[in-house]
């Protein structure tokens, strides 16, 4: 069993899983598994009888992680969860983020059923701040919605240029131009400029992602 992202043996911070969650949840139409207690930041730092304190939730002992006990008592609706005061501030922020991302898989046509195009192959030698070791970008598109997704795995907020190859425009039937976009993660509105083999300017918070949705 793998060590938890939030454990002292790995990242020590459950929020650092969010950019990876966005990529895993939004890159395709496949089912997604949320590891037990992950949405509340399970740390795997209990000292279970057989496994011991190893950053993992044991698969050998009869054990009850606190995060799973909390999840079992939460109301079904997010607003009721907020009002219940069953979660501390950090847990609630994380739970809301997971709720938002997982709901988007169902409510966004592009994420639910859209075509996928990976743009990383043209961004490995960026001169506009895009770091392929810490940033990841891709496109999803249906007839009525397109999404430019950019994940930031670094501890610093970024303002970078994401290059979009001409082949992406041909494959996805994208038009060039300036589009009014909305980040599905934050609700923030912005304009994005799309040109064949050109760069699109994007701002992404630390350890987070943007899902810039626009009408193609």
Stretches with model-predicted labels:
Residues 1:
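Active-site neighborhood of divalent metal-dependent phosphoester/pyrophosphate hydrolases
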Residues 4-178:
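Loop/helix patches that line or flank the sugar-binding groove of alpha-linked glycan CAZymes
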Residues 139, 182, 213-215:
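Residue-level detector of conserved, well-ordered beta-strand and adjacent loop positions
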Residues 145-146, 157, 187-192, 210:
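Short, surface-exposed beta-strand/loop "edge" segments at domain boundaries and coil↔beta transitions
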Residues 178-197:
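Solvent-exposed beta-strand/loop surfaces of large extracellular or lumenal domains
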Residues 192-216:
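C-terminal beta-strand-rich structural cap/linker in extracellular carbohydrate-active enzymes
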């Amino acid at each position: 069993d793998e060590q938890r992202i939030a454990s002292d043996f790995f990242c020590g911070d459950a929020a650092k899983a969010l950019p990876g969650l966005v990529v895993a949840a939004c890159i395709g139409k496949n089912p997604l598994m949320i590891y037990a207690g992950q949405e509340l930041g399970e740390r795997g730092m209990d000292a279970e009888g057989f496994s011991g304190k190893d950053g993992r939730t044991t698969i050998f002992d009869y054990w009850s992680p606190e995060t799973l006990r909390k999840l079992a008592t939460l109301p079904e609706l997010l607003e009721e969860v907020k009002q219940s005061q069953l979660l501390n501030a950090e847990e609630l922020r994380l739970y809301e983020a997971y709720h938002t991302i997982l709901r988007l898989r169902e409510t966004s046509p592009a994420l639910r059923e859209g075509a996928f195009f990976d743009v990383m192959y043209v961004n490995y030698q960026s001169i506009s701040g895009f770091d392929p070791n810490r940033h990841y970008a891709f496109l999803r598109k249906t007839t009525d919605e397109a999404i430019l997704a950019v994940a930031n795995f670094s501890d610093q907020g970024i303002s970078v240029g994401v290059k979009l190859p001409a082949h992406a425009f041909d494959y996805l039937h994208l038009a060039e131009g300036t589009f009014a976009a909305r980040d599905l993660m934050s609700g923030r509105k912005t304009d994005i400029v799309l040109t064949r083999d050109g760069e699109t300017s994007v701002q992404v918070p630390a350890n987070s992602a943007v899902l810039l949705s626009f009408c193609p």
